[in-house]
Design a protein with these regions (language model features):
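Charged, compositionally biased interaction regions
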Residues: 1-214
Length: 214
């Protein structure tokens, strides 16, 4: 079978797969054949993947209550990278969440990279996530690597078919025994200042006038 264009954005190499033999089929007049077009996201499977994640979130929170939100970026095939925000309360909690996520559902075992952040981070904003990774993660302490784990057979980046590594990034604030240093204080405007700026925004930054309307 193959080559076949897949949701990864690559053609799968021809290979041997089980044979399906159809003896007969009945169809009505003017029948509609329903299918999806796969390829590099955004595509139809990525939209379905985002909807399915919303279905699975209650199950995630039931098993891992500290999870506030989870996102599977469509750019990462909708399952190979996960960004998870948690309400952190104790040291080592991010690693517990990583292991729990990989173990919860068979599909989640195919996720290669899990990034865990605090609940003040917008997990759907890459600038926010990258800021957390850059300021709350130390590579010598906050990476958890696992090898020879189940992986997507379509992932030709893995050294062996069906077996590959996983990486967890703890991009949360470090508390308790996770650090011996005083944690930095973040720069934030007060709610009152934000309100005043919002009220006077157009005064500070007037919109250019459209001369064509004169």
């Amino acid at each position: 079978e193959g080559p076949f264009g897949d949701h990864t954005g690559y053609y799968n190499a021809p290979d041997t797969y089980p044979v399906f033999r159809l003896k007969r089929i009945r169809v009505r007049d003017n029948a509609h054949y329903l299918t999806t077009f796969t390829g590099r996201a955004p595509d139809e499977p990525s939209v379905l993947g985002e909807a399915l994640l919303e279905v699975f979130k209650p199950l995630l929170r039931q098993q891992i209550p500290e999870i506030v939100d989870a996102w599977l970026p469509p750019e990462a095939c909708s399952y190979r990278i996960a960004v998870i925000s948690i309400a952190k309360k104790y040291a080592g909690q991010a690693r517990r969440v990583m292991m729990g996520f990989w173990s919860l559902l068979p599909q989640f075992s195919m996720t290669k990279l899990v990034i865990v952040v605090d609940d003040d981070i917008d997990i759907r904003s890459w600038p926010d996530v990258m800021w957390a990774v850059a300021t709350r993660m130390d590579p010598s302490r906050d990476l958890m690597q696992v090898d020879r784990t189940p992986i997507d057979q379509l992932d030709f980046a893995s050294p062996q078919e069906g077996l590959g590594g996983k990486l967890g990034l703890d991009a949360t604030r470090k508390i308790g025994s996770e650090t011996s240093r005083e944690w930095g204080k973040e720069l934030r405007m007060s709610a009152d200042i934000e309100r005043k700026i919002s009220l006077r925004w157009n005064e500070f930054f007037p919109q250019p006038t459209d001369r064509s309307q004169r």
